[in-house]
Amino acid sequence: MLHPLLRHLPLALALCAAGAAQAKNLVVCTEASPEGFDIVQYTGAVTADASAETVFNRLLAFRPGTTEVIPGLAERWDVSADGLSYTFHLRPGVKFHTTDYFKPTRSLNADDVLWTFQRALDPKHPWHASALRGYAYFDAMGMGELIKSVEKVDELTVRFVLNRPEAPFLRDMAMPFASIYSAEYGDQLLAAGKQGQLNNQPIGTGPFVFKRYAKDAQVRYTANPDYYAGKPPIDNLVFAITLDPNVRMQKVRAGECQVSLYPKPEDVPRLKQDPNLAVDEIDALLTTYIAINTQHKPLDAPRVRQAINLALDKKAMLDAVFGPGAASPAVGPYPPTLLGYNHSIQDWPHDPERARALLKEAGAENLRITLFIRNGTSPTIPNPALAAQMLQADLAKAGIQLTIRSLEWGELLKRSKAGEHDLSLLGWAGDNGDPDNFLSPNLSCAAAESGENQARWCDKDFEALMRKAREVSDPAERAKLYEQAQVVFHEQAPWIPLAYPKLFNVRRNTVQGYVINPLSNNNFATTSVKP
């Protein structure tokens, strides 16, 4: 078997050849393979980086390093006084990618925005059924019932009419699931009967043009010479897929990649001492948690879920899995930096005897359950195997037998969304800086139906509070509603909230213009590499 470093020798040789022609290359060591490139079907951060952040743009964007909404494909927008109408004015002359499989004949216009959203909204749209995994984010956030219509005002103006006010709507329009597609490319593929190509050969307006993908090896892009914000400083972007964080660190130290994502937290102090490297860190919008499948008996009983929370020695797990100072204990579904975080809620103490008593009360003694974990790492789960083993030992002290199943990330998501798990070790990276972005995709009734809510938990009281908080615009009123919702969440215990991790990335000190993001997405449109 080839050593992992040797496996990428063809990549290194190819880049050396490119370097001979003085092309400017950026190789990023990433932690997993994307699920696909038709971003509307997926919610994973890896997939968003490989598609939304490279190939596509949205009507709005976030200022790099912040959650501030700024113009994207729309250069300006108007909101009606009643909060029900949003009019977006598109930039003129924005070009879609020209590739060997698509040659656009026109610039971006309102038809592309309508095609993008009608595809998800209208079951009769000719492209609706092409999303074989459905419209995960779109459905989980209730966009189908929120958006009344999407109207073409003129070639460069689009109006969204809502059924109710939605406080985070502008933020939503900057999220990966709202990426704008080419209607012309869609028509071309439909006419040729090649709808599946949309997920394999994407076309967008973004800073990089997709070239090719080799699963579990690499994704290659070239800079978009026609990018509306200006051609990126680098000519070629390569995502070198490297599951093992130790190998990622070896490669960035050896210069085989210039950026390496998500080092193990315990390695960060040592990496900071390397004069050739720079470590970027930020208090990110991240939550690590274990979803408890509330549709599996006896996990449908709140007392059983509370018992599982009580059995865990969370502090010991965080110290071992993340290391000192790299994460704080999670109590609720989102970090304390967001609106309405309820500081009055006390975390579950480590109390295995109380856990045993609750299990006995619920008639769930000698409980046997299975935990799904990923076989790689991520910023929310730097060592899934160790976390699972520690949970297994803690649960055993409360009389619970835990079986651990390690799965490839895409397979874990597929099986968890199908409800095959009892417990699933997961993480969520906020996409827009609003509390609703943690709650609706992961804990709403709509998300339970679609499988994105992997606790499969649907609580009418929680749902009502969450929905009302979306509809009101006053931040103080929204905060009170979210505080109440977190009380319901804590009492019902559909998750074991684990951690609010910090985010770390490592780069060669020749890399400039890279901005680490609290939303945990990675965009290299302004990144350059010094010779």
Regions found by a protein language model. Give the residues of each.
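Surface-exposed binding/hinge segments that line
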Residues: 89, 112, 121-186
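N-terminal lobe/hinge region of extracytoplasmic solute-binding protein
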Residues: 29-82, 118, 125, 201-205
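A bilobed periplasmic-binding-protein/Venus flytrap-type ligand-binding module shared by bacterial periplasmic
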Residues: 222-225, 284-307, 311, 320, ...
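A structural "hinge/loop" feature
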Residues: 33-50, 73-74, 100-104, 167-179, ...
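Detector for C-terminal structural segments
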Residues: 24-30, 50, 167, 214, ...
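Structural transition elements
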Residues: 208, 293, 299, 328-362, ...
